[in-house]
């Protein structure tokens, strides 16, 4: 179980609801992933009209917890307004907070992110901020009241995997009581397993599953990878070494193989 604010969730894989080839494949992929939390864009819901209503019906059929996001927002004001609309529409205080600074990299505006998090937390929101791997930013978000931090592995949709491994490890070491979720940039199941091996509580995926040749099979692969990575972390991974260490005992080695 992993704790998100005052709720305990069984699956450590969070999944997005965009970019799938069809609504049916989206539903099947989410089911196969075993995810309990699904992110949804308010912009898609608000602008979709009848199509938006149909999409929302599909999500409700899955029986999952909805995590609305502020995707596409590029200012504090826009993000705060979108979050308030999402609370009214979805009936939840949860919000995945995104404030984007750059169109090419989709890098978070960390200054605006902290400001928006402060405003929303004071207004009763439980904020899931999408941020960089910068420790100082994460600490400011914690000071703003965030109990969940979602640093990226790499730019959104890049599929590059974990680029700044040491920085993500530092976040885990310095924020032991905060729920940490790797969000964005994961492209392969092995990337998700690596994040879990670092001790992260969960990962959030969308493009890597939705854009796979077989999204449903890829959802299953990521589910297994997350489980394997977490199990490995809990089992206690041996540390890396600079030199070889024999795994076969020398006791009982034939004398003619012994080193003089």
Swiss-Prot record:
Main location: cytoplasm
Pfam families: ThiG
GO molecular function term, any single one: thiazole synthase activity
BP GO annotations: thiamine diphosphate biosynthetic process
Catalytic activity: [ThiS sulfur-carrier protein]-C-terminal-Gly-aminoethanethioate + 2-iminoacetate + 1-deoxy-D-xylulose 5-phosphate = [ThiS sulfur-carrier protein]-C-terminal Gly-Gly + 2-[(2R,5Z)-2-carboxy-4-methylthiazol-5(2H)-ylidene]ethyl phosphate + 2 H2O + H(+)
InterPro entries named in the record: Aldolase_TIM, Thiazole_synthase_ThiG, ThiG
UniProt EC number: 2.8.1.10
Localisation per UniProt entry: Cytoplasm
Pathway it works in: Cofactor biosynthesis; thiamine diphosphate biosynthesis
Keyword Transcription carried by entry: no
GO cellular component: cytoplasm
Active site: 96
Function recorded in the entry: Catalyzes the rearrangement of 1-deoxy-D-xylulose 5-phosphate (DXP) to produce the thiazole phosphate moiety of thiamine. Sulfur is provided by the thiocarboxylate moiety of the carrier protein ThiS. In vitro, sulfur can be provided by H(2)S.
Assembly information from the UniProt record: Homotetramer. Forms heterodimers with either ThiH or ThiS.
Name of this protein: Thiazole synthase
UniProt lineage: Bacteria, Pseudomonadati, Pseudomonadota, Alphaproteobacteria, Hyphomicrobiales
Primary gene name: thiG
